[in-house]
Amino acid sequence: MNKVYSVEDFPLDEKTMMLHETLFHNANGYIGVRGTLEEGVPQEYNTMRGTYVNGFYDVIPMKQAESLCNLVEEKETMVNVADVQTMHLSFDGETFSLFSGEITNLIRTLDMEAGTTTRSMQWSSPHGHEVQIQFCRMASFTHKSVFTIACKVTSLNFDGELTVSSKHSGIVANYANPSDPRLAAEGRAYLRPQANILENGVSYLVTHTTKSNLELCTAVAHRFSKPGSSLVTYNADAHCYETSYTCRLHPGETLLIEKYTVIQDSIRSDNCLQDAQKEIESVYGKLDALYQQQREYLSEFWKCANMEIDEDDESNLAIAFNMYQLLQSCGSDGKCGIAAKGLSGEGYEGHYFWDTDIYILPFFVLTNPALARGLLNFRYSTLDAARENAKLVGHQRGALFPWRTIHGKECSGYFPSGTAQYHITGDIAYAAVKYYLATGDTEYLIKEGAEILIETARLWCDVGNWYDGKFMINDVTGPDEYTCIVNNNYYTNACAKYNLNWAVKAANILRKMDAFHALADKLALRDEELDEFQRAADAMYLPYNEKLGINPQDDSFRIRRASCRERV
């Protein structure tokens, strides 16, 4: 099945360029780099030039109309960590740009078997210099901290001096668009310079977040295929290194520029600089080996994930594209999840929602259980924060997972369509059960899964109430965010019923493995509480209209008779 998506001779308008920045981004679940042009765009163009690390964040104020008890007053936001893309090419003083001279054979390609994006074109400069240029990018799946750019310049008729100017900037601003609620964060830099080092031609920039107290190190190294003069300079004001390289290029000759970037952060590393040094040394000059490893990794992925619809190439390519985006977005180390926009940009500020657990995780459960386990490990790592979140909104027991988060705290500033969506707690419990049923991973159930099920079941018992022999859940918001704060949302109640039933089942499974007492001691869990879970599950009210034979969305749902008038 074809797994190459490409566009040719596309318009160079702002809307198309922004779309392509997303479609042709590179990511591996840890780092993500938007598909902006290495050489940049005209100043009047809107662009989102960004590099992101999954789970790396800063903390900023959350503005509220009024200050009320336990309203969210600050939030976590994903940080644009560096600019390692910028690369300018100059031919006898004429700087390459898609917006000057004449461009032909312009193609952008995403190869989902090679794990690379390419952009190639033939450029005729205003003075008639003709060159073939290709950029190839890769975020390595086998070396998660590594991002590479390979630029190949072939002279068609140019005979002169080629100058390359490549930047490594550690202070960059986040993007903001006040008219778009998905991008309403502040457009400012969240990193501060901490150190800069130039060692054996490799530039290292160490930065620090302003409030979350996280550290990041980026390392950049270049390799040129032709002899030439090279100089690396540092601009302290911009916390930026610039590598300048010059060589002679004759017709028929090709220059290959390899740019290696390594990113390390203090969430995963105890010494970011040292680990960046080790990794850049291990991969430098080994681009072909990295390409081969990337192909081998994706070959294994497609063996498990591949599916085809007979005689429908367009749908097959669309399915492959979406599967590949899931893979690019998926955190695998238990320290991060899957952001609403993946690592393609700053939409929703890099927050994790219920999408991960109810829509995406089941795909990995069936195709790559190890990745699914990593996502569940991350949710477990935030369980204590979920317990605290439950207390903040007034519950006596249990765990309430946040509607949107990065590190575990609630980052939704609007309660009715945010925190009130209690179903996310049931979604996470559902994901834990589906993983266990598909894999039979009892170790997960013992170490993490059962604890999540018990704590979330406790929440439902605290949230719900008994009325006329039925267990009901009031004042919550279901997946329909246009109908906020309702009683007995069908989806929420069904999730809670499933959650409560499985809390009891998990406890019984652990009894058979002699693992129950350790969990019971840890959680102060008694058989009477398990009986309470079962009673609530058995009596859970699921709205049903007997006359129409349907399940209303919630107690406030109204079915209106359609009114049709004959038109002449």
Stretches with model-predicted labels:
Residues 55-57, 172-180, 345-350, 381-389, ...:
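Short, mixed-charge aromatic SLiMs
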Residues 344-352, 399-447, 455-542:
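The feature captures the catalytic groove of carbohydrate-active enzymes
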Residues 558-568:
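Residue-level detector of conserved catalytic or cofactor/ligand-binding positions
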Residues 125-128, 156-158, 329-333, 366-374, ...:
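Secondary-structure transition/capping motifs at alpha-helix termini
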Residues 300-305, 309-321, 326-329, 484-487, ...:
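Long, charged, mostly alpha-helical binding arms that flank functional sites
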Residues 290-437:
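Substrate-binding groove/exosite segments of carbohydrate-active enzymes
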Residues 1-348:
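Acidic/polar, glycine-enriched structural segments that form the non-catalytic walls/loops
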Residues 136, 150-152, 165-169, 246, ...:
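Short, well-ordered alpha-helical packing segments
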